[in-house]
């Protein structure tokens, strides 16, 4: 399958004014690429976890006034949804693309997962690549670079996942529009795989 990488014009959809207008641009320019990525990487994750993964392209159906500032495809083991489960994401903000694994506030497994992560805290600190980033709110683009974190910083983020009702924790990479301009399709797909690979052990900890 030939999958086109995201281009600089794809990031520009988030400058389109108006909910209907921006959603039209997203559906035309971004969703076909997310669908193709969904098919390919649902299969990849199923193969590497021995579980059946399904993909879910964000519909932004609850939005009535404000247009979305990001969009994505998510991967989970539930055919009906992903928010209630540990899941993977590939998506775009206006400033960058992202590839994540994580748990968001709807997930009821947060406490158990946080305890599992804390038991393997030193492994997480060592094995997560230095150029990966951590997010504590999927609705905001701000992140913390892994190599800048002390073990205590990571511990606090994980503990927050267990103790704060609305807490979230996601980890992965950001790719700038400039980086995409130098990437071939094959390099982009390889980048997704090389990002998911060190995140698979975190998924396994969620399901031990």
Swiss-Prot record:
InterPro entries named among the record's database cross-references: UPF0637, UPF0637_domain_sf
A Pfam family this chain is assigned to: DUF1054
HAMAP family: UPF0637
Similarity comment: Belongs to the UPF0637 family.
Protein name: UPF0637 protein BCG9842_B1177
Organism (species): Bacillus cereus (strain G9842)
């Amino acid at each position: 399958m030939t999958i086109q990488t995201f281009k600089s014009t794809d990031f520009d959809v988030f400058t389109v004014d108006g909910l209907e207008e921006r959603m039209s641009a997203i559906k035309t320019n971004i969703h076909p690429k997310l669908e193709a990525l969904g098919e390919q990487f649902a299969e990849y994750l199923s193969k590497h976890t021995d579980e059946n993964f399904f993909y879910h392209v964000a519909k932004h159906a609850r939005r009535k006034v404000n247009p979305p500032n990001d969009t994505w495809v998510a991967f989970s083991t539930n055919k009906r949804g992903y928010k209630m489960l540990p899941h993977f994401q590939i998506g775009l903000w206006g400033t960058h693309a992202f590839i994540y694994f994580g748990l968001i506030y709807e997930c009821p497994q947060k406490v158990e997962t946080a305890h599992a992560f804390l038991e393997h805290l030193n492994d997480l600190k060592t094995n997560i690549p230095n150029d990966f980033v951590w997010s504590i709110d999927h609705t905001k683009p701000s992140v913390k670079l892994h190599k800048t974190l002390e073990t205590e910083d990571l511990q606090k983020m994980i503990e927050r996942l267990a103790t704060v009702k609305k807490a979230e924790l996601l980890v992965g990479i950001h790719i700038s529009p400039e980086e995409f301009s130098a990437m071939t399709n094959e390099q982009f797909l390889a980048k997704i795989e090389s990002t998911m690979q060190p995140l698979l052990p975190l998924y396994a900890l969620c399901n031990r």
